[in-house]
Amino acid sequence: MKVILASKSPRRVEILEKIVKEFEVVQSNFDENTIDFKGDIEKYVKDLSRNKAIEVSKRLNEPSIVIAADTVVFQNGKVLEKPKNEEDAFSMLSSLSGNTHKVYSGICLINTYDDTVVTDCDCTEVRFSELNPRQIRNYINSGEPMDKAGAYGIQGLGGAFVEGIKGCYYNVMGLPLNKLYKALENYDITIL
């Protein structure tokens, strides 16, 4: 059975390559702005990932396992997604500075052969160092934070700001590897 990653994220591709030998990338065209956060962060990221997977699965013509994910940073009851602009990135990074936040990723697997849907969620706590405005501006000027939830990438320059994590490192990158591995074990595909 074919494996399809419903994401254009190079980080998700890199993570999936660790456990699945062959897969295709098909970007989801689902509009994330059609789902509003209503207080339940786990439901929110699972709903987003499920809708991404559904959109891709409807375009496929052969039996496949479609994998989709959505990752957000959550702090003080607020969802921090990708920054809209540099000012938004500055605001996000300033709020993360010296504090602990949580990163939630929802994953969804759809088996298009029998239309079974599996969703799950992972959470990782991340502790940030205290950052001054110059450090934040320099990081924003690198361009790295602009396409990442919470305006930082733990696997890149943003990793220098992380004092520690509790939970899955790959979840912070955008795809909870252990949860995904366990979910994929239920399918007849080659993993590892």
From Swiss-Prot:
Keyword Hydrolase: yes
Lineage: Bacteria, Bacillati, Bacillota, Clostridia, Eubacteriales
Entry GO terms, CC: cytoplasm
Top-level taxon in the UniProt lineage: Bacteria
Gene Ontology process terms (BP): nucleotide metabolic process
Protein name, per record: dTTP/UTP pyrophosphatase
Compartment annotation: Cytoplasm
Catalytic activity, reaction form: dTTP + H2O = dTMP + diphosphate + H(+); UTP + H2O = UMP + diphosphate + H(+)
Family assignment from sequence similarity: Belongs to the Maf family. YhdE subfamily.
Role of this protein: Nucleoside triphosphate pyrophosphatase that hydrolyzes dTTP and UTP. May have a dual role in cell division arrest and in preventing the incorporation of modified nucleotides into cellular nucleic acids.
Coiled coil (UniProt feature): none
A GO MF term: dTTP diphosphatase activity
Primary subcellular site in the record, as a coarse category: cytoplasm
Cross-referenced PANTHER family: BIFUNCTIONAL DTTP/UTP PYROPHOSPHATASE/METHYLTRANSFERASE PROTEIN-RELATED, BIFUNCTIONAL DTTP_UTP PYROPHOSPHATASE_METHYLTRANSFERASE PROTEIN-RELATED
InterPro entries in alphabetical order: ITPase-like_fam, Maf-like
Keyword field: Cytoplasm, Hydrolase, Nucleotide metabolism
Entry EC no(s): 3.6.1.9
Record-linked HAMAP family: Maf
A Pfam short name: Maf
Site (Important for substrate specificity): R11, T71, Q155
Keyword presence, Cell cycle: no
